[in-house]
Amino acid sequence: MSVGMAAPRAAFSCDPDRSRGRQFAEPPSSNRSAFRRDCDRVIHSNAFRRLKHKTQVFVFHEGDHYRTRLTHSLEVAQIARAIARQLGLDEDLTETLALAHDLGHPPFGHAGERALDACLRDHGGFDHNAQTLRVLTALEHRYPGFDGLNLTWETLEGVVKHNGPLTDRTGAPLPRHAERGVPIGIAEFSQRFDLEIWSFASLEAQVAALADDIAYDAHDIDDGLRAGLFRVDDLRAVPLTAALIDGISRRYPALGESRRGAELVRELISHLIGAVTAETMRRLGEAAPRSVEDVRHASTAMVAFPSETAVAEAEIKAFLWTHMYRAERVMAVMRDAEAIVADLFRRYCEHPADLPPDWLPADGPVAECEADRFRRIRNFIAGMTDRYALTEHQRLFDSTPDLR
C-alpha cells in the first residue's frame, strides 16, 4: 500500500458507534462521530490554546521558529494520522489523542515538571499524564452540565495509557510505577470510571504514543540544528542518520546546511513512519486480533518499531540527550526555570491570598486543609504558560531570571 493511502476500516480499530460512552450522558451529534466531537472539544479548549506559549525545549522568547507544545502536538497529530490511515484505524480518535497528550504539561517543559514533582513529593508528586486527565475531566469549565470536556472512554483511556498499562491484572503497579505507585489522580479517577489501567490501550492510542516519539526525535534535531547546538555532520555519530545523510549527499552534493537539515528531518520522519507501520502490520498478522478488545488483552503492544529501528531510535535520543538536552546553554535556562516554578509554589503556599480570586476556595484560604491547598496550587501553576509564570514571578518577587 502506498504511504498516505487509506486502508479499509479494520475490525480491530475503535468504532465510534460502539464507544463505551462518556461520564455524563449526552445525545449523539447528527453530523459528527463521537471521536470527532472529542477532537473538536480538545481543539476549542483553553488548555489547548495555552500550548502555544508552553516550552518544548527552548523558552518562548528565544525564536519564532522553535517548537512549542502546540506545534509539537500538531506535528504528532499529522504523523499519527498518517500511520492510522495505513492501518485502517479511526483517524479522529488518533488525532484527538495526539492533540491532547501534552495538555497537562506545566510551564517550561520538563523543568517545570521536575520542580512541581519536588514540591509535591509528600503529596503524591506530579505526573503530566495525570494532570492531562484532570484537565480533560475537571479543570476545563466550558459546559453547563459538567466540568471538563466529557470525552469518550476511549479518549480518556488513551491519555492515561500513553506509556502503556500501569498495573498488572492484580492491580500491582508495573515496574515504572513500582517505587511511587500509580499516579494518584489516575488511580482515583479509574475507581470512579474504570479505565482498565491493567490492559493495553487501543491501537489508535498506541499509534499516537509512537508518533510522539517520532516527532520528538525529528523535530528536536531540527531545533538543535537551528540553535547551532550541533551540525548535520555531527549526526553521523548515529548509524541511521549517517546513512540518511550519505544518501542526501549523493543526491544533492551542493545542498546548503539548512536544507540538508530539513531534508534529513523529512527523510527521518518518513523512515520511522515506514518502519513502525511495517512492524505493526507484522505483529497484527501474527496476533490476528479480531476486535479492539483483542488488542487491549494482548500480551504485548501491537504498535512498535522493529528491533533494529528501536536501537537506532534510542541512539538518536542518546545523541540529543548529550548534544541538546544536557547542553549547558539549555541546562542553565532550565535551572532558572525550575527555580521560578518552585518559588511560585512556595509563595502561594505561604500566601494563598496571592492567588487570583477565581483560584481561591469559596470559604477562603484559611478554611482549606494543606492537601487541598497544594492541589489547588498545583492545578494553577500547571496551567500557566511560560510567559504567565514569568509575569507572576515578576509581580511577586524582587528579582526574576530572564531565561536567556
UniProtKB/Swiss-Prot annotation:
Swiss-Prot/TrEMBL GO biological process terms: dGTP catabolic process
Positions of the HD domain: 69-217
UniProt-listed SMART domains: HDc
A Gene Ontology molecular function term of the record: dGTPase activity
This protein's UniProt keywords: Hydrolase
Coiled-coil regions listed in the entry: none
Taxonomy, superkingdom: Bacteria
Region (Disordered): 1-33
Record has Secreted as a keyword: no
Keyword Transmembrane: no
NCBIfam families: dGTP_triPase, PRK01286.1-1, PRK01286.1-3
Family: Belongs to the dGTPase family. Type 2 subfamily.
HAMAP family: dGTPase_type2 (MF_01212)
Protein name per the record: Deoxyguanosinetriphosphate triphosphohydrolase-like protein
Organism of derivation: Rhodopseudomonas palustris (strain HaA2)
